[in-house]
């Protein structure tokens, strides 16, 4: 008799029972309890929200400051909404080329987006972001993932390194060299500035503009002979989905990873959870031609109904495009489903063996007890929910805890082309 898998926290009990059968009386029903948080060890960790009441002795200047702050916040919200609508209109003009004719260079669209986001981010303060708790949660996930698979003295290659947001995390792991490659030249420039401004980073950083997935890495790294290949670690955070535009790009991405790693090296990262995407699509009626879901801070939209028309299966493991919008971060950029079994199969073909795959919420619950006292007080505060537990809540929970999964592979043999 087959063993039923544990119910994902984002799946309703009704859907689980329909797919796997009703839970028996003798089974442990605690599996259905939501596990995205863990209670802090003392009541002192509880963060109380700002007091909403105003006492009679608050000065007029404080009231004026609050009003100015509220006015500014309202204007910022309106500005972001205008930018989002403009981006949606621009994207609609490209959808036919992106989906049917496939002649638009998605790399250019992604590059332009992240160049633009870099300039916008330089003008805004991170702690004013409407998704600050989501950012904190994602950072915690990366801290724990990097620490788990990175060792002292390692040479690290990060594909899609962005603005170098993980440099300090790798510094804490004690690496000796960091090679970062990203398609956005503006992001690489910002990563250079970040590295130069950071103190006590005892490792060499080589930051390169290049295409990690569309061509051989040799094209990008050839002018940098100081890069110490093969590496101990290859990491890709929130970007591998771009490689699944075509089978050719996905294979090139995995070949780049394999050729860059020494035997025994680790390849790890974060990607959208294909099972969660399938779950959400299954919840939408089959007559909906452009399936879409989300909330006030994020949305995902498929431009066709191929999934339902193909019997609730993607017609191909490659090229299954959707557009993703995340408030203050992603502006309706094309992304691609990464069927995890396809990723695992490709990795195996290129000499890498799966050692970990786990949704964010489960990974967080598993690892956070080891990290409660290792995180800084500021980090712990940023992870504390309104109920005194560590995690993420409200409208930020779905795009943070449920949408993504962590993975890790180990290179066990050389790939022979």
From Swiss-Prot:
Enzyme class: transferase
mRNA cap 0 methyltransferase domain location: 129-412
Catalytic activity: a 5'-end (5'-triphosphoguanosine)-ribonucleoside in mRNA + S-adenosyl-L-methionine = a 5'-end (N(7)-methyl 5'-triphosphoguanosine)-ribonucleoside in mRNA + S-adenosyl-L-homocysteine
Listed SUPFAM superfamilies: S-adenosyl-L-methionine-dependent methyltransferases
Signal peptide: none
CDD domains reported in the protein's UniProt record: AdoMet_MTases (cd02440)
Principal cellular location given in the protein's record: nucleus
Site (mRNA cap binding): 163, 169, 194, 241, 335, 404
Keywords: Methyltransferase, mRNA capping, mRNA processing, Nucleus, RNA-binding, S-adenosyl-L-methionine, Transferase
One CC-aspect GO term: cytosol
Places the protein is found: Nucleus
Short name of one Pfam family: mRNA_G-N7_MeTrfase
Molecular-function GO terms, alphabetical: mRNA 5'-cap (guanine-N7-)-methyltransferase activity; RNA binding
E.C. numbers: 2.1.1.56
Taxonomic lineage of the native organism: Eukaryota, Fungi, Dikarya, Ascomycota, Saccharomycotina
Recorded family membership: Belongs to the class I-like SAM-binding methyltransferase superfamily. mRNA cap 0 methyltransferase family.
Reported function: Responsible for methylating the 5'-cap structure of mRNAs.
Positions contributing to mRNA binding: 138-139
Residues that hold S-adenosyl-L-methionine according to the record: 142, 160, 182, 211, 237, 242
Coiled coil residues, start to end: none
Name listed for the protein in its UniProt record: mRNA cap guanine-N(7) methyltransferase
Record bears the keyword Disulfide bond: no
